[in-house]
Every structure is written in C-alpha cells, then in structure tokens.
C-alpha cells in the first residue's frame, strides 16, 4: 500500500493517534436493556492489539465476539450500550468522541461484516459502491477510482472484474458478495482491519487467498488485524494470538500455537476437538461438555422427540431424486424465457445428472459461482430449469413436454439456506417462523400439538425456549442459522437440501448440528 500524504487533512492530535495505532480495551462491559431484562453481551473484556499483530477472537454463537468488534467503531445497535470500560487508540479514549471515530472509521479502520447480503446496497451497482467509498476518503478522480475498484476486485479473486463491476449484489453468489465486501474494506488502505467472519461464505481456495492477502497486508503495512471467526483453521493459519469467549467472558487467551496445542478451558478444548480430521472418515464428531468431559451421544434425547412426531421410516433403498441433463441459463438481457439466448447469457448449470437414494447423503462441492446453489434451488422449485428432466419419488416434476409441477413435492423437500438473515422474516417472532410451515401443511393441528412441535424443534437445534418470543435481529448469525434449520425440519421432510448449513456456526455447534442431521437420517 502506498499512502500519499495520508494525514495531511487531519489535525496533529488525530495524526498522532492514527500513525501510532494501538488498540487497547480495558474492563469493557456491554449490555442490552429490554423491557423484561438486561442481557449482558460482554463482561470485563481486556486485550491489546499492536501493529503487525493478527488477533483472533473465537467462541460459540452469541458469545459476544461481534459485539466487541462493533463497540470498537461505535456501531452497537440500540438498545445495546457500553455500560463501563475503556476503548483506546494509542492511549486516547474514544468513548463519546464521535468526531475522532468518524475520522478513522472507513479510512483507517476497515470493517468486513459477517453478512455480505446486508452489507451491500441492493439498489446500486458494485462499481458505484466502491467508487463512492474510495472518493469519500481518497483524493482520486472518478476514472482513477474506477480503475482502483477493478484492481481491488481482481485482488480478491473475482474473474472478469471489468464486466462484473457493472453488476448488482444479487447477481453474485454468496461467496462472491463476501469478496466484494472485503474489497470495500481494504479500498481506503486502512491501518486496522476488523474482519467479522471474513471467509465464512468463501470456498477453501478463495479462503486461502483472502487469508494470505490479510497476512501480506499486515506484514507490508505493519497493520493490526482483528479476525472474529468460528473456524479454528483460520485461527491456526492466520493469527499470532487468540482470545476464546463464552457468554460475554474471555475464558482463555494467549499465543495461538500454545493455546491450540494445550487448551486449558473446556470451551477451548471443545472448539479444538470438534475440528474433523482430514485423513479419515468419522461416524460422529466428538463433543466436550462445559465440565470438560466428553459427550458420547449429543442428541439421543432429542431424537426421541423427533421420532414421536416424525415417525420411523424403513430404509427401502428407493430412488428418491434424479436429475437428467439439467441445464440452467440466466440471460442478463431479458427475464423472458422465450428470448433467444445471446452471448451475454450465463450458463449456471450445464448438463448435470445424478441420483439420490433414501438414506444417502450426497455432497455437492465446488468454488463460489460453480452452480451448487442453483442446483439446490432447481430441486426445491425456487428456480425453473432451462432444459432437462427432474424426478422426485417416481414423479416427474419437470421435463421438456410438461409444466413445472413442483407442487407435487411441496413440503417433502425442504432447504436450509446459506444466508440465515435474509431467509427469515424480520417481522415474525421465532415461534411464528417455525410454526408457519407446520400450520400450512397440517391444517387441523391443535394449538397444544403445534406448541409441542415448536418446542421440540427449538430443543433439537440447541436453543432455549425463551428465544421463541424474540425476533431474528436479536440473535447472532449462528443462532439465526439454527432457527433456519428448525424451520426446515418443521414439515418432516424426506429430502433435506443444506446449502452451506453450518457456514455461520462455530465448530462445536457445527459438530452438534451435523451429528443431529446424521441421527435424524438414521432414525
């Protein structure tokens, strides 16, 4: 990064703060006050970050990781507030000093948010959003800002950047949207990068590129980087030191290598032991209870509730799903299916065929934009194929001679979406979100049975029943994903399509959910 007079327009005191950037947090306490109760999001948090360091903050969903990051740049949503403690940059307190925060936010502190869908403005092209950010903080002409924007997209791994920069956010896959967000964060050459789950939506090859980029920037520019993640692989490969959080408390912190090799707290042990081995297949993930003992069966009691309402199906080895030469073409010039395909059309799925039998688990893997999610949406009826045949349980749902007949399988095929926030109705409480599909497919269900089913489902995904009376925005990303899973299970599906179902979850919760899905399948 070449910084051309980066502090010329700032007064001397702010220049000093920026050039000697050092993040220090002392006894930080953050809480959310509601009418019924006060929820403590963080309690007595203490840590420092020096230039050239990469600090990892890891912990289960709802442990307070993202809240700490938002507090640093004064972006805590109401009714959240800092009740006590100190946040410093080079020994200068930032509380109630909005002018200083505005000077450094964006230009000297870059932020990568967890949810790329809600971080980008759906009404503006990527080009406009990048140029606006660059010209707000850097003295560049429109053409210079445009060229810098194209270079940034190429740097974060977006092919054909000159063309893609003209697209809107919805025209990118989840992983590609996250790359755009990262490009925005580094666009103004910051001194500190706060990355909240920066690689959650990216495939492994692009994850590696982004993490290498962060390490390279840290070394060349002598940056400070805070990475908030649930991915222990990211922690091991990238960070110098790590903080483990649980229920708003720091339960362990230290050198990354020492902590991973010899975790002392049960929380740290749980995160380390839940990482699956790459050299062998395992039947179940190991889990650690809060007292430090190993859990041999994580969901035995929960599956009893499933069997009670679901029933037990015999494994017949029956063919459940078949795709025959499925092709999907998106024409960016017209929404008409009858228009002749032109040179700008995107062939998202090309001649794909496979079968799935009852009791089987099929893994569909590929880089961002390879067509994985499009195939999932075709099977569930959210996207209509251009060509090919689709059969479910012996019924033809689509072929070249018939209308799309996805209603035949409605309810029996359910999907867990990649982005938990945009797939949940923000106006519904969790109770209503889970109950809605049950009421739709079981018209005559009694109120008591409905309530019992909802309670069982929220138990299954490891959340308290108090959460049923809250709204989606009141939860962390991982907790929202668990709500999505509960809703998908509500109709007792025969085929469950999981589009990155654990991407927003920490590794210990990933292990619980995957063990649970395996138990449901076995039953």
Language model features: what each stretch is:
Residues 253-254:
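ABC ATPase "signature
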Residues 144-163, 448-466:
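Conserved ABC ATPase "signature" region
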Residues 187-191, 490-494, 510:
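A short, proline-enriched helix->beta-strand linker immediately N-terminal to the Walker B motif
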Residues 82-93, 388-398:
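Conserved ABC transporter NBD signature motif
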Residues 73, 77, 380:
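Helix-to-loop junction immediately C-terminal to a conserved catalytic motif
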Residues 106, 170, 188, 473, ...:
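Conserved signature/switch motifs of ABC ATPase nucleotide-binding domains
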